């Protein structure tokens, strides 16, 4: 969860997790919690253009998971970058930190805000513009990331107090310009149009 302070705050809100040492990560049943599947889609899209090697961030050998009585096995709601990372780089041993999934609507909303903020931080890693689909990324963010988190971000960056992610704000997070993202969108549209044209010619 980052620093000790945020870990302490997190545990205060969501309870201290039980620690399980997992020696066979492949055998453990972890699925994305359905309430958080939209945020997971945002991560999957962002991973396509990720240039930063996550192993350089010295990932701690742990993963936060949640036990929800409505679902079998463990579910995951946040820190999806590490779930994706450990799924691709199977660890020999990993500590699985098991929280009880909140049954209270306000706590679930709070967890969505936490997961949304984590995703926004993840976007500030280095991404390869040539592998990014800005329009798709923007629409996924506006569909699934907490609008309150986006509103706070717009205010922080002196943009209009909107609850949606503009291309301008997305560019700011990705450390590039709006023009670069517009150009990338045009390139993608042109490629798509070329494919459609070819299909029409062959039909």
List each language-model region with its residue ranges.
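Short, charged/polar connector segments at secondary-structure boundaries
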Residues: 1-97
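Generic surface-pattern signal
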Residues: 15, 55-59, 116, 146, ...
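Exposed alpha-helical structural elements
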Residues: 45-49, 110, 136, 169
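Short, flexible active-site loop motifs that bind/organize anionic cofactors or intermediates
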Residues: 75, 160, 171
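Amphipathic, charge-rich alpha-helical segments that serve as recognition/docking helices
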Residues: 94-163
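Short, solvent-exposed alpha-helical "recognition" segments
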Residues: 157-161, 179-202
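Short alpha-helical "recognition helix" segments of helix-turn-helix
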Residues: 166-172
């Amino acid at each position: 969860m980052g620093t000790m302070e945020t870990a302490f705050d997190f545990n205060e809100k969501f309870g201290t997790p039980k620690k399980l040492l997992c020696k066979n990560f492949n055998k453990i049943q972890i699925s994305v919690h359905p309430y958080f599947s939209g945020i997971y889609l945002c991560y999957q899209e962002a991973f396509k253009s990720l240039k930063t090697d996550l192993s350089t961030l010295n990932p701690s050998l742990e993963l936060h998971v949640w036990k929800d009585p409505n679902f079998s096995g463990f579910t995951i709601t946040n820190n999806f970058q590490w779930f994706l990372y450990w799924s691709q780089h199977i660890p020999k041993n990993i500590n699985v930190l098991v929280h009880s999934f909140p049954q209270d609507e306000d706590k679930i909303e709070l967890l969505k805000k936490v997961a949304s903020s984590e995703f926004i931080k993840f976007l500030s890693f280095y991404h390869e513009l040539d592998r990014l689909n800005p329009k798709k990324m923007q629409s996924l963010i506006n569909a699934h990331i907490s609008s309150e988190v986006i509103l706070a971000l717009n205010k922080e960056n002196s943009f209009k107090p909107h609850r949606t992610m503009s291309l301008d704000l997305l560019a700011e997070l990705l450390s590039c310009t709006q023009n670069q993202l517009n150009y990338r969108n045009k390139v993608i549209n042109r490629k798509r149009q070329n494919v459609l044209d070819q299909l029409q010619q062959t039909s």
